């Protein structure tokens, strides 16, 4: 049976369009607020409302999938995201936009839970790494192309909202031509997020998603600031960020394939070790290009491998709940990491960004090394 079936390919096509819209809005919303002369703290609050929406959306999507299935949950998530986009054109204001970005955040989180859960339920322990790698490749490619779109088209609010909304609605179309079966509805017992978080045999996967959130959130949010403080121009900052993201895209498929072939525990150990090496290399500033490349290739691929590790430890009907737990863990890490790193950078030194990344990665590496010989056979193999 092919790894990339017709439903999987159509699902990824829809995700690409939705990710383009997400990237465009995430880039332009802060700029629109600044043009409206809102103070910086209000711009930050609007951004926080989006991430709060992500948390809320993550919590209830599993129940929704169980009730109405993958397809309808996907349609509903896309429509909620589209509503959050259209609402931005009603009125530019702090409370209005905070509400609409909260709604958009819910829709986006629902999309991620639906897509990730559908891919995991479609795969097996032998190909789930490649499926999640393809998901991350599409996600990062959509993010990259979204940045290109922002630089090529008019950034005016009322010019952008119509075609972005159209792109969101177009993202629904691929799934109208296929049906993703939700085998979880056949299970007698449903699983909760809290139960998945407490599952001992999957704890390394959960911790890996938290670490991944800390690493990626810090790199995405604070690397441009670090480079700016090194005296680089905006064009140079854009180039080095492109190197970082491109490395993440290029690393997805090989890492997924290696994880499926040689085991996720071994690949996770190598990835975390490489993240530590890349962080140390960034501190020396001896060779920024290779240092950033290996940091991106290893750091950006942690999440799908950690997910695949956790998902092979649960029964098939528990996959949706496990995915919610993993996405929630990643979100928490991506909120905590940049906040703590920014505080260290402001009060002490910019180099503490990479010291923090290396430190949390080292702690996770110790957890992975302690797990030697404790690798029970996967149960989610059907």
From Swiss-Prot:
State any single GO MF term. Answer: transmembrane transporter activity
Topology within the bilayer: Multi-pass membrane protein
One Gene Ontology cellular component term attached to this UniProt record is: plasma membrane
Which UniProt keywords are present, listed alphabetically?
A: Cell inner membrane, Cell membrane, Membrane, Transmembrane, Transmembrane helix, Transport
Q: Name one Pfam family in it.
A: MFS_1
Cytoplasmic face: residue ranges?
Answer: 1-7, 66-74, 123-130, 178-203, 252-269, 312-324, 370-382
Localization, per the record, is:
Cell inner membrane
The family database entries (InterPro entries) matched by this protein are listed as: MFS, MFS_dom, MFS_trans_sf, MFS_YcaD, MFS_YcaD-like
The main location class comes to membrane
In this UniProt entry, which residues form the Periplasmic topological domain(s)? 29-44, 96-101, 152-156, 225-230, 346-348
Among SUPFAM superfamilies, the record links this protein to:
MFS general substrate transporter
Q: Which sequence ranges are marked TM in the entry?
A: 8-28, 45-65, 75-95, 102-122, 131-151, 157-177, 204-224, 231-251, 270-290, 291-311, 325-345, 349-369
Quote the PANTHER family the UniProt record gives: TRANSPORTER MFS SUPERFAMILY
In which family does this protein belong, per the annotation? Belongs to the major facilitator superfamily. YcaD (TC 2.A.1.26) family.
Q: In its UniProt entry, what is this protein called?
A: Uncharacterized MFS-type transporter YcaD
Q: What species is given as this protein's source? A: Salmonella typhimurium (strain LT2 / SGSC1412 / ATCC 700720)
Q: Which gene encodes it?
A: ycaD
């Amino acid at each position: 049976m092919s790894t990339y079936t017709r439903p999987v390919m159509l699902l990824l096509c829809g995700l690409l369009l939705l990710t383009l819209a997400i990237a465009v809005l995430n880039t332009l919303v802060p700029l629109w607020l600044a043009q409206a002369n809102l103070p910086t703290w209000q711009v930050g609050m609007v951004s926080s409302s989006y991430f709060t929406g992500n948390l809320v959306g993550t919590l209830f999507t599993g129940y929704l999938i169980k009730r109405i299935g993958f397809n309808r949950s996907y349609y509903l998530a896309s429509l909620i995201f589209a509503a959050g986009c259209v609402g931005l054109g009603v009125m530019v204001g702090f409370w209005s936009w905070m509400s609409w970005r909260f709604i958009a955040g819910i829709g986006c989180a629902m999309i991620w839970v639906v897509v990730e859960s559908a891919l995991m339920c479609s795969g097996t322990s032998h190909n789930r790494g490649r499926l999640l790698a393809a998901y991350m490749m599409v996600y990062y490619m959509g993010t990259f192309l979204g940045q290109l779109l922002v630089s090529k088209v008019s950034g005016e609010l009322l010019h952008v909202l119509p075609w972005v909304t159209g792109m969101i609605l177009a993202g629904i179309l691929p799934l109208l031509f296929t049906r993703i079966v939700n085998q979880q509805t056949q299970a007698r017992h449903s699983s909760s997020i809290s139960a998945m978080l407490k599952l001992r045999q999957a704890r390394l996967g959960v911790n890996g998603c938290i670490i991944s959130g800390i690493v990626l959130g810090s790199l995405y949010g604070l690397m441009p600031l670090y480079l700016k403080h090194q005296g680089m121009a905006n064009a140079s900052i854009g180039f080095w960020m492109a190197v970082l993201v491109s490395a993440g895209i290029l690393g997805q498929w090989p890492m997924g394939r290696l994880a499926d072939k040689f085991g996720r525990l071994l690949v996770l150990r190598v990835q975390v070790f490489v993240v530590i090496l890349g962080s140390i290399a960034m501190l020396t500033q001896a060779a920024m290009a290779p240092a950033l490349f290996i940091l991106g290739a290893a750091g950006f691929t942690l999440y799908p491998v950690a997910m695949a590790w956790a998902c092979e430890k649960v029964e098939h009907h528990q996959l949706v709940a496990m995915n919610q737990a993993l996405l929630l863990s990643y979100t928490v890490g991506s909120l905590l990491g940049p906040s703590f790193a920014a505080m260290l950078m402001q009060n002490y030194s910019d180099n503490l960004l990479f010291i923090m990344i290396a430190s949390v990665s080292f702690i996770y590496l110790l957890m992975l090394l302690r797990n030697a010989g404790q690798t029970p056979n996967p149960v989610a193999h059907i």
